[in-house]
């Protein structure tokens, strides 16, 4: 779809959506996004130029269907997939991608760390994906050095970053906000550094006693990104890994640096979103969202969860969806899903499904709470179908039609019950919606009550 859009841009020094927007040009991607979001193209252009909205769309990802992440657009959901040294198969990861897109993932991150050829699995995922693909390049940088922090050089990091751009990755998590002077602030935490990328860079800085190379070479990374229109997802290396560590000095020190880097990327006209926690008590979620908006000049916020309790292994998709709904309500632009396997193991296909549905609920609830135009239309349509006992319509409008039908059919599987005015909860004689009271009856009652009031 995008081939004809991209061809005229070849050879230009800066082909980012932000660069076009700042120059008053509405791209085909902006027009496409405007139709999907039911917003004026001029507003999309203005928000991209301002940095409040991004369209992750690498020019080498030609089969991409552009989408928007930002406060002006609907709240989005990301799904993480990826092979590990202990569980790996390219075909399985491609199937996870397809399942994620089926159940509504707006973007997908390939977090593969080993066990397969990382280039091959990434290329297979990008080839099959119509949604933006994100990666964390430091994983492959470490793998390319055979797991040796000592052998990793600054150029190794940049080489992998450009390789990901060349392959069509739409956004990359760049852990540039973690500075060597932040590391002592981790003392006193219960869980220390829980970001894999952050942990790699912390070890690199400690070994070499040098500043974070992704920070010192940040302008070089911007030069790479502007050639491909790759978007920054600025990683939060010091995100809290438990409630005890939330909103501490380490997290907030890095956030301040992320704000500085956001504005530096904008001077290059490179798009940015900023990643956030993590594990946060409910009473601190609003503070975290507002603080990010303040420090990062309203760049789109992209949070993992956050989990609102630490005692829910096996059910972390529920704990985190509670926090995600609140974060979305307060203005977070994209929610990174958490699966039931979080903290326990690599998610399988069913875990991907469970996590995504939980997060589609959270994002949708946030859109309703933020009074986005049309956000509640589907809810109202389903409610009408429920009141009219239109079971097939209810299934169709559900976030997970297959699961809704499965649960209904466990007790009433015959086709005749698709027209029944009851379910197995109340049975045929006790459903309150079965005894409908007409509007005429209610009007008549209201008239009688009015007369009674008048006569008193």
UniProtKB/Swiss-Prot annotation:
Listed cofactors: [4Fe-4S] cluster
Record bears the keyword Cytoplasm: no
Biological-process GO terms, alphabetical: thiamine biosynthetic process; thiamine diphosphate biosynthetic process
Keyword annotations: 4Fe-4S, Iron, Iron-sulfur, Lyase, Metal-binding, S-adenosyl-L-methionine, Thiamine biosynthesis, Zinc
EC number, UniProt record: 4.1.99.17
Short name of any one Pfam family annotated for the protein: ThiC_Rad_SAM
Protein name: Phosphomethylpyrimidine synthase
């Amino acid at each position: 779809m995008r081939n004809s859009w991209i061809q005229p841009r070849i050879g230009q020094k800066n082909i980012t959506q932000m660069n076009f927007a700042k120059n008053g040009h509405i791209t085909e991607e902006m027009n496409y996004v405007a139709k999907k979001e039911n917003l004026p193209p001029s507003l999309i252009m203005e928000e991209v130029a301002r940095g409040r909205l991004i369209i992750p769309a690498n020019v080498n990802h030609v089969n991409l269907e552009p989408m928007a992440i930002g406060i002006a657009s609907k709240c989005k959901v990301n799904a993480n997939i990826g092979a590990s040294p202990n569980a790996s198969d390219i075909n399985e990861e491609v199937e996870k991608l397809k399942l994620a897109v089926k159940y509504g993932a707006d973007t997908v991150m390939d977090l593969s760390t080993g066990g397969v050829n990382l280039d091959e699995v990434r290329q297979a995922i990008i080839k099959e994906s119509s949604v933006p693909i994100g990666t964390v390049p430091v994983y492959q940088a470490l793998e390319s050095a055979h797991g040796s922090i000592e052998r990793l050089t600054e150029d190794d990091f940049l080489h992998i970053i450009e390789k990901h751009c060349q392959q069509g990755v739409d956004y990359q998590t760049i852990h540039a906000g973690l500075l060597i002077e932040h590391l002592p602030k981790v003392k006193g935490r219960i869980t220390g550094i829980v970001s894999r990328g952050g942990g790699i860079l912390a070890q690199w800085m400690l070994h070499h006693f040098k500043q974070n190379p992704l920070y010192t070479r940040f302008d070089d990374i911007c030069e790479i990104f502007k050639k491909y229109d790759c978007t920054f997802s600025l990683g939060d290396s010091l995100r809290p890994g438990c409630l005890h560590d939330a909103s501490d000095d380490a997290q907030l020190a890095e956030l301040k640096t992320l704000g500085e880097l956001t504005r530096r990327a904008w001077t290059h006209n490179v798009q940015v979103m900023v990643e956030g926690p993590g594990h946060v008590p409910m009473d601190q979620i609003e503070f975290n969202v507002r603080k990010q908006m303040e420090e990062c000049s309203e760049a789109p916020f992209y949070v993992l969860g956050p989990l609102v309790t630490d005692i829910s292994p096996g059910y972390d998709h529920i704990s985190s969806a509670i926090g995600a709904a609140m974060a979305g309500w307060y203005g977070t632009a994209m929610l990174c899903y958490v699966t039931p396997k979080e903290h326990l193991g690599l998610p399988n296909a069913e875990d991907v499904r469970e996590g995504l549905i939980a997060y589609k609920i959270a994002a949708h609830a946030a859109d309703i709470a933020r009074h986005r135009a049309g956000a509640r239309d589907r809810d109202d349509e389903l409610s009408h179908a429920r009141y009219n006992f239109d079971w097939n319509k209810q299934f169709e409008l559900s976030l997970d039609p297959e699961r809704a039908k499965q649960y209904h059919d466990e007790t009433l599987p015959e086709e005749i019950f698709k027209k029944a005015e009851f379910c197995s909860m109340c049975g045929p004689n006790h459903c309150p919606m079965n005894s409908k009271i007409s509007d005429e009856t209610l009007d008549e009652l209201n008239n009688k009550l009015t007369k009674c009031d008048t006569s008193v």
